[in-house]
């Protein structure tokens, strides 16, 4: 004979396997989403939620009860199976309906709608009376069946107990929210003041940089004016130099072709650009030195032909 504990152990094994599958599904989903996680924390959270949903929804007890019914049927005790004939049709329909009911129960439990709330909503409904603030509480067919089946008890002590909504201290909650709001407001003001100080500092640095740039521009302008004046003075000096040399050249007893050659070189001096003028003067001086050297060589050769000697004093 099949022991009753064996079927219950099989159901417990299936439930545990479902929990492990839920943990694997949760961790693999987090990995696919690129979210870092602590396996122990995920395991603990999933286990807590899984145990609560399975217990509160009644799915665990329902499965264990069916395991007991199957074990009794296999052992020749058909009483439980006969009692459940009202909802039995065939195995496929029962499995599908059972799956849907379990899914709905677990969904409601995961949304915070616990077993107490589901039972009360299934047993009672409220009918509003038009024109009145009061209402009529109606019992459903399920409540009637429970009363007839002796599943309803009267708890006189429950009347004296305060409802959860009456124990809520709204003033303390308001004070907490007000403190949180004030703290948030203070943090926002601190960040705003910090931003204002940074903005002021940036403006001060910008104004300081503008002053430095303005001073540098003034210095550059003064230097440009000095350079322009210096260039004008050099142009005047070069023009005066050319005129003075030309006047001095005309007073010399040199041949006209020599004077003309020197005047052409003087007139070729660029009096506008000082750099070019210096190059032209350098070229003129080189030519004069070269002419002087040639003249000296000619004079030296002439003295030698005349059997004269020369000496520098």
From Swiss-Prot:
Principal localisation: host cell
Which GO-annotated molecular functions does the record name?
RNA binding
Q: What binding partners and quaternary form does the record give? A: Homodimer. Interacts (via the coiled-coil region) with host ZC3H7B (via LD motif). Interacts with host EIF4G1.
Q: Where is the stretch described as Dimerization?
A: 150-206
**Compartments (UniProt record):** Host cytoplasm
Q: Name its GO BP terms in alphabetical order.
A: regulation of translation
The annotated region (RNA-binding) lies at: 1-149
Lineage here is:
Viruses, Riboviria, Orthornavirae, Duplornaviricota, Resentoviricetes
Specify where the region named Interaction with host ZC3H7B lies, as residue ranges.
170-234
- What does it do? Plays an important role in stimulating the translation of viral mRNAs. These mRNAs are capped but not polyadenylated, instead terminating in a conserved sequence 'GACC' at the 3' that is recognized by NSP3, which competes with host PABPC1 for EIF4G1 binding. The interaction between NSP3 and host EIF4G1 stabilizes the EIF4E-EIF4G1 interaction, thereby facilitating the initiation of capped mRNA translation.
Give the highest taxon in the source lineage.
Answer: Viruses
UniProt lists the family membership as follows:
Belongs to the rotavirus NSP3 family.
Positions of region (Interaction with host EIF4G1):
208-313
Query: What name does UniProt use for this protein?
Result: Non-structural protein 3
Q: What SUPFAM superfamilies does the record point to?
A: NSP3 homodimer, Rotavirus nonstructural proteins
